[in-house]
Amino acid sequence: MKTEQLMTFLISPEQTIVEAMQKIDANAKGILFITNTDRKLIGAITDGDIRRWLIKTGNLQEQISRLMNRNPKSVYRREVASAQDVMRRYSITALPVLNSKGIVIDILFEQEQKTEVREGSLSLDKVPVVIMAGGKGTRLYPYTKILPKPLIPIGDIPIMERIIDKFRDVGVTDFYATVNYRKNMIKSYFTDTAKDYEIKYVEENQPLGTAGSLRLIEEDFEQPFIVTNCDILIHADYEDIYRYHRESGNELTIVSALKNIVVPYGVIHSSENGAVQSMEEKPKLSYFVNTGMYILNPELKKEIPEDTFYHMTDLTDKLLKENRKVGMYPISEDSFLDMGEFEEMHRMEKKLDLKSE
């Protein structure tokens, strides 16, 4: 591994959670190794460690030294032949290689020929997925004057088909689509495309918001179900998201993404009497935002009012006012792709390494 590539996996203990999330996005392996100024190994941190920390504290500015594993596994250069055995023995996917002075000189990764199901894996083959596909997509005019938003192509594949393909990768076969605007075009496309899954259509007679059409689903779900907007892609472990929802005891789980926003001006901090206390040049603010993907307990469907314009925010507010458990599952900024606007659509194509037509 070249030094430049190696450095994408190394981070200092003083750096923050936000910085670690950005580095993990960049290396796309879900792990970082913490080193001191001499590049000696002192710890490791995974995206799972960060997610658990954020769920517990929500603190993005804490130093990663607070939550790193201080006893990471490693091998010396002379022991490289045993690396795969070490990774299997300890159920880890990455292993740093050290020289005789304890300096990280390489990172080895789990061989990818393994196909067996990991212990603790969770099948989603019986989990219903509801795709909210009834909106007009006004932010994507003039495209959506011709095509409904779910059929807008990202590359050469409609966004809704890409969403379905992501869920098919984890075994989902039970899909529902709430439709309204140009619904016959959507139904025709998926009818004419030979697929190994079924889509049940739920037809709105009027706009019902981001949650109202869930009440129109006649089936009584026996387990928590997934709801997703039709204009987003989430690159995350769907099985882990679902497992977190069940194990945490949430009634509603909101998949949330880190969003870094740079204010394009100098920000003035002042006292109550208008005296300037400090000025910050183009500060970067970090927030967790709603991605538009949720996991709901089945009984919530009946709590949505009939024939009423009702947003998912309305349902969330209702649960919180009743002191019921609503949780979030945090993901990184680059794990959330949104095509709701032209700029974001082109970003999605670039992220997926697709060429815009």
Language-model regions: role of each:
Residues 1-23, 27-29, 34-37, 41-42, ...:
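Bateman/CBS regulatory modules and CBS-like beta-alpha motifs in cytosolic regions of diverse proteins
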Residues 30, 93, 173, 223, ...:
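Short acidic/polar active-site loop segments enriched in Thr and Asp
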Residues 49-65, 112-126, 288:
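A short, polar/charged loop-to-alpha-helix boundary motif
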Residues 55, 157-229, 240, 270, ...:
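Conserved N-terminal catalytic core of the sugar/cofactor nucleotidyltransferase
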Residues 121-186:
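N-terminal glycine-rich phosphate-binding loop and ensuing alpha1 helix
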Residues 225-226, 233, 239-246, 259-262, ...:
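Catalytic-core segments of class I nucleotidyltransferases/pyrophosphorylases
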Residues 248-258:
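A short, conserved acidic/glycine-rich loop-to-beta-strand motif
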